[in-house]
Amino acid sequence: MNGKSVTVTMRVTSMGNTLMHEMRGADRPDDPITMFVVDGDRVLLTHYCDADNRPRMAGTLSPDGKTLDFNFLDVTGNMKYGHMQHATFTFIDANHHVEDWTFQMPGDKPMHAHFDLQRTK
């Protein structure tokens, strides 16, 4: 984001039922956590935001299986600073994916973040 390096760690947890996504950056005071879970025929995410709220989104997989697009469902917690509104994950290959996140600021002003992520060993 803004040319700065971030590290995203993903791991399967809860007996294989949940995927945890943690984003860390050298200049970040805290790490936002996003949890993904399959709920029937859809994928849900809950984003534990450093804005002190927890938006939920439902994902839709593209017909080619390369893009997972998440749309806002609801949010709990503090809304003073805004909330995460939308996320898109584009899968390039097994070691490379892109994440696009939209944070809805107060006054309905969107702020976009783009991450081009590659697996490291």
Where are the language model's segments positioned?
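Hydrophobic small-molecule pocket/channel-lining residues, especially in calycin-type beta-barrels
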Residues: M1-K121
